[in-house]
């Protein structure tokens, strides 16, 4: 029984020693998460950018009933311009996604660790009560 009680503080100190590498792994996880987030946002935004020129074409098509030849070449360059501007909008938005996602993940991890520690404490107290009785 004495050996078990001595082994419990060792595991408790191991939890504290493991808390620092977990914060390092969190930053690594945030970096990988942000990269995957960038890729997913590229795909979703490229779809929206392809839809937005199509919506611009519909009104111009309605107005171009008088002259199809003059406005058909004019409608093709604006979608290219929109794509370039959308790409320029990507760069300022990416750091905000990076910056916002990491603290949320850290808070969630801290909460999970606290719950695990509390569950272990409750189990230890329960075991000691049952042993003493």
UniProtKB/Swiss-Prot annotation:
UniProt keyword annotations, A-Z: Chromosome, Developmental protein, Differentiation, DNA-binding, Metal-binding, Nucleosome core, Nucleus, Phosphoprotein, Spermatogenesis, Zinc
GO molecular function: DNA binding; zinc ion binding
Residue numbers covered by motif Nuclear localization signal: 111-119
Biased composition (Low complexity): 46-72
Biased composition (Basic residues): 79-93
Modified residues (Phosphoserine): 133
UniProt subcellular location: Nucleus; Nucleus, Nucleolus; Chromosome
GO biological process, one term: spermatogenesis
Main location: nucleus
Entry binding sites for Zn(2+): 12, 16, 26, 30
Listed Polar residues bias regions: 1-33
Entry comment describing in which tissues the protein is expressed: Testis.
Annotated region (Disordered), positions in chain: 1-133
One GO CC term on file: nucleolus
Function comment: Plays a key role in the replacement of histones to protamine in the elongating spermatids of mammals. In condensing spermatids, loaded onto the nucleosomes, where it promotes the recruitment and processing of protamines, which are responsible for histone eviction.
PANTHER family: NUCLEAR TRANSITION PROTEIN 2 (PTHR17488:SF0)
Family as reported in the entry's similarity comment: Belongs to the nuclear transition protein 2 family.
Protein's name according to its UniProt entry: Nuclear transition protein 2
